[in-house]
Amino acid sequence: MIANAMLTELLLLRQGAEFFALELTAAIEALELPVLAPLPDAPASLLGMLTDRGAAIPVFSASRVLEVEGRGNGDEVLVIVRDGDRQVGLVVDEVEDVIMADLTTMQRPLDSMRGDGVVRGVVHSGNRLVAVLDARAVVRVVVRALPKLA
Protein backbone atom coordinates (compact mmCIF):
# COMPACT_ATOMS: atom_id res chain seq x y z
CA MET A 1 0.00 0.00 0.00
CA ILE A 2 1.33 3.44 -0.89
CA ALA A 3 1.70 5.68 2.18
CA ASN A 4 0.17 8.70 0.44
CA ALA A 5 -2.79 6.81 -1.03
CA MET A 6 -6.15 8.60 -0.82
CA LEU A 7 -8.33 5.79 0.48
CA THR A 8 -12.09 5.99 0.07
CA GLU A 9 -14.66 3.83 1.84
CA LEU A 10 -16.83 1.91 -0.61
CA LEU A 11 -19.95 -0.16 0.02
CA LEU A 12 -19.34 -3.44 -1.82
CA LEU A 13 -22.44 -4.81 -3.56
CA ARG A 14 -23.00 -8.06 -5.41
CA GLN A 15 -25.38 -8.46 -8.33
CA GLY A 16 -25.30 -11.96 -9.75
CA ALA A 17 -21.64 -12.83 -10.26
CA GLU A 18 -20.55 -9.18 -10.53
CA PHE A 19 -19.23 -6.83 -7.84
CA PHE A 20 -20.11 -3.15 -7.70
CA ALA A 21 -19.38 -0.44 -5.16
CA LEU A 22 -20.72 2.95 -4.14
CA GLU A 23 -18.88 5.56 -2.14
CA LEU A 24 -20.10 5.06 1.40
CA THR A 25 -21.10 8.73 1.63
CA ALA A 26 -23.66 8.17 -1.17
CA ALA A 27 -25.26 5.09 0.42
CA ILE A 28 -27.69 6.28 3.08
CA GLU A 29 -28.71 2.84 4.30
CA ALA A 30 -29.19 -0.79 3.36
CA LEU A 31 -32.27 -2.68 4.53
CA GLU A 32 -34.34 -5.76 3.90
CA LEU A 33 -36.52 -5.28 0.86
CA PRO A 34 -39.88 -3.98 2.15
CA VAL A 35 -43.24 -4.17 0.42
CA LEU A 36 -43.27 -1.50 -2.28
CA ALA A 37 -46.19 0.50 -3.62
CA PRO A 38 -46.52 -0.27 -7.35
CA LEU A 39 -46.90 2.50 -9.91
CA PRO A 40 -49.18 2.06 -12.93
CA ASP A 41 -47.50 2.19 -16.34
CA ALA A 42 -44.05 2.11 -14.74
CA PRO A 43 -41.05 0.85 -16.70
CA ALA A 44 -39.88 -2.68 -15.86
CA SER A 45 -36.84 -1.32 -14.03
CA LEU A 46 -39.05 0.55 -11.52
CA LEU A 47 -40.12 -1.93 -8.86
CA GLY A 48 -42.26 0.55 -6.92
CA MET A 49 -42.18 3.36 -4.39
CA LEU A 50 -41.09 3.36 -0.77
CA THR A 51 -42.11 5.96 1.78
CA ASP A 52 -39.26 6.51 4.23
CA ARG A 53 -39.25 9.29 6.82
CA GLY A 54 -41.89 11.15 4.85
CA ALA A 55 -40.01 10.98 1.54
CA ALA A 56 -41.26 9.05 -1.50
CA ILE A 57 -38.33 7.05 -2.87
CA PRO A 58 -38.49 5.30 -6.25
CA VAL A 59 -36.99 1.80 -6.07
CA PHE A 60 -35.27 0.25 -9.07
CA SER A 61 -33.85 -3.13 -9.98
CA ALA A 62 -30.04 -3.11 -10.07
CA SER A 63 -30.23 -5.90 -12.66
CA ARG A 64 -32.06 -3.62 -15.07
CA VAL A 65 -30.11 -0.44 -14.30
CA LEU A 66 -26.71 -2.15 -14.47
CA GLU A 67 -27.71 -4.64 -17.19
CA VAL A 68 -26.44 -7.58 -15.11
CA GLU A 69 -28.37 -10.74 -14.26
CA GLY A 70 -29.19 -11.08 -10.59
CA ARG A 71 -29.82 -14.19 -8.55
CA GLY A 72 -33.42 -13.22 -7.75
CA ASN A 73 -33.60 -15.63 -4.82
CA GLY A 74 -35.87 -13.49 -2.65
CA ASP A 75 -33.09 -12.31 -0.32
CA GLU A 76 -32.42 -9.03 -2.10
CA VAL A 77 -31.35 -5.91 -0.22
CA LEU A 78 -32.52 -2.34 -0.77
CA VAL A 79 -29.75 0.27 -0.82
CA ILE A 80 -30.87 3.90 -0.58
CA VAL A 81 -28.58 6.04 -2.76
CA ARG A 82 -28.34 9.80 -2.43
CA ASP A 83 -27.16 12.56 -4.72
CA GLY A 84 -27.76 15.93 -3.13
CA ASP A 85 -31.41 16.07 -2.08
CA ARG A 86 -32.49 13.23 -4.38
CA GLN A 87 -32.79 9.65 -3.16
CA VAL A 88 -33.45 6.45 -5.04
CA GLY A 89 -33.55 2.82 -3.99
CA LEU A 90 -31.50 0.18 -5.73
CA VAL A 91 -32.35 -3.49 -5.14
CA VAL A 92 -29.21 -5.65 -5.17
CA ASP A 93 -28.59 -9.32 -4.49
CA GLU A 94 -26.28 -8.70 -1.58
CA VAL A 95 -24.38 -6.07 0.39
CA GLU A 96 -20.99 -7.69 0.93
CA ASP A 97 -18.83 -5.36 3.00
CA VAL A 98 -17.22 -1.95 3.31
CA ILE A 99 -13.87 -1.86 1.53
CA MET A 100 -11.13 0.74 1.22
CA ALA A 101 -9.87 1.68 -2.23
CA ASP A 102 -7.53 4.25 -3.70
CA LEU A 103 -9.71 5.83 -6.39
CA THR A 104 -6.70 7.62 -7.88
CA THR A 105 -5.59 4.19 -9.18
CA MET A 106 -9.03 3.37 -10.59
CA GLN A 107 -8.91 1.96 -14.12
CA ARG A 108 -11.22 3.04 -16.91
CA PRO A 109 -14.37 0.95 -17.20
CA LEU A 110 -14.54 -1.65 -19.92
CA ASP A 111 -16.44 -0.54 -23.03
CA SER A 112 -19.18 -3.01 -22.13
CA MET A 113 -19.67 -1.17 -18.81
CA ARG A 114 -19.98 2.33 -20.18
CA GLY A 115 -23.75 2.33 -20.73
CA ASP A 116 -25.28 5.44 -19.20
CA GLY A 117 -22.09 6.42 -17.42
CA VAL A 118 -23.09 4.77 -14.15
CA VAL A 119 -19.70 3.02 -13.87
CA ARG A 120 -16.86 5.42 -13.01
CA GLY A 121 -14.12 2.86 -13.21
CA VAL A 122 -12.77 -0.42 -11.89
CA VAL A 123 -10.70 -1.13 -8.77
CA HIS A 124 -9.16 -4.30 -7.39
CA SER A 125 -10.28 -5.61 -4.02
CA GLY A 126 -8.40 -8.75 -3.14
CA ASN A 127 -8.81 -11.04 -6.14
CA ARG A 128 -11.99 -9.30 -7.32
CA LEU A 129 -12.57 -6.63 -9.91
CA VAL A 130 -15.08 -4.12 -8.59
CA ALA A 131 -16.97 -1.65 -10.79
CA VAL A 132 -17.26 1.64 -8.91
CA LEU A 133 -20.62 3.30 -9.51
CA ASP A 134 -21.14 7.03 -9.93
CA ALA A 135 -23.99 7.80 -7.51
CA ARG A 136 -24.93 10.98 -9.39
CA ALA A 137 -25.23 9.05 -12.68
CA VAL A 138 -27.22 6.25 -11.01
CA VAL A 139 -29.70 8.76 -9.60
CA ARG A 140 -29.89 10.63 -12.92
CA VAL A 141 -30.54 7.44 -14.91
CA VAL A 142 -33.26 6.14 -12.63
CA VAL A 143 -35.00 9.50 -12.18
CA ARG A 144 -35.08 9.88 -15.97
CA ALA A 145 -36.90 6.51 -16.13
CA LEU A 146 -39.67 7.64 -13.77
CA PRO A 147 -43.09 7.90 -15.39
CA LYS A 148 -44.47 11.40 -15.60
CA LEU A 149 -46.99 11.68 -12.79
CA ALA A 150 -50.01 13.85 -13.45
Question: PLM features: what roles do these ranges have?
Answer:
Residues 1-150:
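An acidic, low-aromatic, low-complexity terminal/linker signal
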